[in-house]
Amino acid sequence: MEVKKLKECCTIIAGQSPESKYYNSNGDGLPFFQGKADFGELYPSIRVYCSQPTKIAEKDDILLSVRAPVGPTNLAPCKVCIGRGLTAIRPSEVLLTRYVLLFFRYFEAQLASKGTGTTFKAITQDVVKNLEIPIPPLPEQERIVARIEELFSQLDAGVETLKKTKAQLAVYRQAVLKEAFEGRLTIHVPVNLPLSWESSDETNTLPAIPEEWHYIALKYLGDLGRGKSKHRPRNDPKLFVDGKYPFIQTGDVKAATNCITSFTKQYGEFGLSQSKLWPKGTLCITIAANIAETAFLGIDACFPDSIVGFTPNESILAEYVRYFVESQKIRLWAFAPATAQKNINLDTLENLIVPYCSIDEQRVVISEIESRLSVCDSIEQTVDTALQQAEAMRQSILKGAFEGKL
């Protein structure tokens, strides 16, 4: 089979970013793509236009991301302007566009490995131009493309089923939590409230609960406090000099299954002086970006004011509160103003109305929840593994195709 360098069989157009004064969002000029940010599965989404384009790609040219990240591809949906993060590739008459596109998707990881740079990885035009591509006869290219797309179609159908299963598991999880906190999973025991507590009368819009239970604001059930990170800018390197105090962020809370033990940053003494070290076992509740994500500190750690720490009093189990907050995610999201980054304030959490029952019944509620959700978690893990295998299978199909094994 003949093999040629890309520059010998394709027209290659390096992107160049026009001056920003020519950018607009009202459709003046050509659609403008700077890099991968707008990429979809096959075609990018148009968000920005350029009235004075410098480098142009034609409809169905292959758009290759050449910097941060290197390798992803899309097709130009029409005549477009391309910025420095992209290179356009226009196959000659000896190549099918879909064949070249699929070749790049097969070669993506290897191409990414050729990236250089410290701040972000990028590849030069020489790397693109000298990339070698096998060129079988056009009928064979058509056969390869048709076979890949047939197998991808079958794989996509399986992936769609897996995603539906995952969505159904999320619905089931919320249904379990709803039943648990409406008292439908336990035998009820009357509980008396301390005189200092105020049972909430604002229950008209809340679900009915057993008469032995009470609706209580979360502020009566423990101490709530926002994390601290007073210094600006928050990423100032001097905060992390000689770092030894774990610094937890909202992403770390979301990524934790139950207990936070991993982190990417550590405060030094200066960082600690403008923050607060929370003890191991604190329940972390996110209130910005990722709202109502929860996890327990598995270590002493600092965190910013986008996370609230909760320490229960003797009348409530922290795990009970954690599951209840999880059940209220949609409701808490509704309290967030319509801004670029969703967030709620501490007052919203303090006044979150909790269905309160005795400690013994809380233990049973937790047990009933966990016995059901453990099955759910096991199935979800199986689904996630299958989704990862599907992506690996996609690469295996491409590998087989371009090694002549299909």
Residue ranges of predicted features:
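Alpha-helical structural signal
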Residues: 60, 97-100, 129, 148, ...
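Sequence-specific dsDNA recognition surfaces
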Residues: 7-22, 29-59, 201-204, 219-238, ...
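A short beta-sheet element
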Residues: 34-36, 44-108, 122-124, 249-250, ...
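Hydrophobic pocket-lining residues within nucleotide cofactor-binding pockets
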Residues: 38, 128, 181, 185, ...
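Short amphipathic coiled-coil heptad-repeat segments
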Residues: 150-206, 381-406
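Non-catalytic DNA-recognition/assembly elements of restriction-modification systems
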Residues: 1-16, 130, 134-145, 200-230, ...
